[in-house]
């Protein structure tokens, strides 16, 4: 947004036969500044002279350091003569200046436009056309610069305009490789989980088989103890059989000795006649007793042999079955050990493969992260270049708007000057001074111009009269266009 305020003062005085000068100054600043213009005319005659100063406002860029000067005027009458001068300067993106001067003589308050002044106006118009031509050239250069910036942005700096088609195939290939590696990694993880489950299953089976083996070994130990007990019982029975055999032999020996004794006793013939009951036959009784003992001994021997044979067969069967179970358990344990060793070897190979794949995955992720970082840095640098170009474009746009604003204000001031000059050429009756104050902004702006016209007419040298006319011009400007104008006139 730019704000400019200008003031213009105009004063004139005329006499009968003197000379007068008139000058005009105009200044403008770029950006936010305040400029001032001054227009004055002086004339003097034989009897007196006139001079007028009007208030003006000066300020620098930004609207700071404002100094306001007061205005005063005076008039006098006398003989005639006059001169006219005009000057203007402009600052900002471009500027121009012109001046004119002339002299003449006459008696009266009217101002005549001479041929000199027409030439000066022609020069002024030529300079204005030159200034407008420069403005057009600046606009064309600005448009060309904007076109070059736009082309540069479209060709170089815009990320969307860069041709990344050469990288699409590489990116797609890398993405396919990443997906394949991810699938392979997932399959490996699944295989590892399956191997862990199988290892847990085999560990459970191993523990069950180990418990069964321990129970079988405990049974075998119990059977061994039972076998030892049976062996000891067998040896005891054999010892008892041997004892019984020895006792039987001893009994047989005693029986034979008794038989021999009885026989020796029976060999002597004793004839004793007694009246007694008939005696039993001792040999028959002894034979019966012998048969009875022999039958009992044979029966006991048969029973012992049968019991021993039965127990021996039972123990042999149990030992054979236990030995078979033990051999089966040993073969199963050896098979389980071989399976466990194979699974442990496979687990170690899978773990080593997992470690190598994890290292490969980490290296791949690191490499792609580095590439992504480089691409991100490139994108960041391109974004910074884009931001700087946008800021340059905005700055140039603001400068262009400022130049357009200055051009508009200068055209308005030139139009106002032309209107004043046309008003003077149409024959104003008195010298006039006019002050125009304008204020503008980017939106709605209004301008109020106050004109003070003072004239002094020369009557006979003995009498001098002064007439003051005040003209207040109010203009409403929207976006550099005059919307409404109103004038108020006062005469004092």
From Swiss-Prot:
Residues covered by region (Disordered): 1-48, 426-470
GO cellular component: intermediate filament
Record Gene3D superfamilies: 1.20.5.170, Single helix bin, Vasodilator-stimulated phosphoprotein
Pfam families to which the protein is assigned, alphabetical: Filament
Region (Linker 12), start-end ranges: 263-285
Bias (Gly residues) ranges: 13-34
Region (Tail) location: 425-492
Keywords on record: Coiled coil, Intermediate filament, Keratin
Positions of region (Coil 1B): 171-262
Domain annotation IF rod: ranges: 117-428
Region (Linker 1): 154-170
A GO term, aspect molecular function: structural molecule activity
Keyword Coiled coil set for record: yes
UniProt-annotated stretches for the region Coil 2: 286-424
Signal peptide: none
Annotated segments matching region Coil 1A: 117-152
SMART domains xrefs: Filament (SM01391)
TM regions (residue ranges): none
Keyword Coiled coil: yes
Bias (Low complexity): 1-12, 431-470
Assembly description: Heterotetramer of two type I and two type II keratins.
Membership in a protein family: Belongs to the intermediate filament family.
Function: Type 1 keratin. May maintain oral mucosal cell homeostasis and tissue organization in response to mechanical stress.
Other notes: There are two types of cytoskeletal and microfibrillar keratin: I (acidic; 40-55 kDa) and II (neutral to basic; 56-70 kDa).
Record protein name field: Keratin, type I cytoskeletal 13
Origin species: Oncorhynchus mykiss (Rainbow trout)
Gene (name only): krt13
């Amino acid at each position: 947004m730019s704000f400019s305020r200008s003031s213009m003062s105009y004063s004139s005085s005329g006499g009968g036969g003197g000379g007068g000068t008139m000058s005009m100054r105009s200044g403008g600043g770029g950006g936010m500044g305040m400029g001032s213009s001054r227009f004055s005319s002086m004339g003097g005659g034989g009897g007196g002279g006139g001079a007028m100063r009007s208030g003006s406002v000066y300020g620098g860029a930004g609207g700071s350091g404002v100094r306001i000067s007061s205005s005063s005027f005076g008039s006098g009458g006398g003989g005639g003569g006059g001169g006219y001068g005009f000057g203007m300067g402009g600052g900002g993106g471009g500027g121009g200046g012109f001046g004119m001067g002339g002299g003449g003589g006459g008696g009266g308050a009217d101002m005549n436009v001479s041929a000199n002044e027409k030439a000066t106006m022609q020069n002024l118009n030529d300079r204005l056309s030159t200034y407008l031509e420069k403005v057009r050239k600046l606009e064309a250069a600005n448009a060309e610069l904007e076109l070059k910036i736009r082309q540069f942005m479209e060709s170089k700096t815009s990320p969307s305009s860069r041709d990344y088609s050469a990288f699409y195939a590489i990116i797609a290939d890398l993405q396919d490789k990443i997906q394949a590696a991810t699938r392979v990694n997932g399959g490996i993880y699944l295989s590892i989980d399956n191997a862990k489950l199988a290892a847990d299953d085999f560990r459970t089976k191993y523990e069950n088989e180990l418990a069964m083996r321990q129970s079988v070994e405990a049974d075998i130990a119990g059977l061994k103890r039972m076998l030892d007990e049976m062996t000891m019982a067998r040896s005891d029975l054999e010892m008892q059989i041997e004892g019984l055999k020895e006792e039987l032999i001893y009994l047989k020996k005693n029986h034979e000795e008794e038989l021999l004794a009885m026989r020796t006793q029976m060999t002597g013939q004793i004839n004793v006649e007694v009246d007694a009951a008939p005696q039993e036959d001792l040999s028959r009784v002894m034979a019966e007793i012998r048969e009875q003992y022999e039958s009992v001994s044979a029966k006991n021997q048969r029973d012992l042999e049968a019991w021993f044979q039965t127990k021996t067969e039972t123990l042999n069967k149990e030992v054979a079955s236990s030995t078979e179970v033990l051999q089966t358990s040993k073969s199963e344990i050896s098979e389980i050990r071989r399976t466990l060793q194979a699974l442990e070897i496979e687990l170690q190979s899978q773990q080593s493969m997992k470690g190598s794949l994890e290292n490969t995955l980490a290296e791949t992720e690191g490499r792609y992260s580095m590439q992504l970082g480089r691409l991100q840095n490139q994108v960041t640098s391109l974004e910074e270049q884009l931001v700087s170009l946008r800021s340059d474009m905005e700055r140039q746009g603001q400068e262009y708007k400022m130049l357009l604003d200055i051009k508009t204000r200068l055209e308005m001031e030139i139009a106002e000057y032309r209107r004043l000059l046309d008003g003077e050429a149409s024959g104003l009756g008195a010298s006039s001074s006019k002050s125009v104050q304008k204020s503008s902004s980017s939106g709605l702006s209004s301008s109020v111009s106050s004109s003070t016209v003072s004239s002094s007419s020369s009557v006979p040298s003995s009498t001098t009269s002064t007439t003051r006319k005040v003209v207040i011009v109010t203009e409403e400007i929207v976006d550099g266009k005059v919307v409404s104008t109103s004038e108020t006139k006062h005469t004092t």
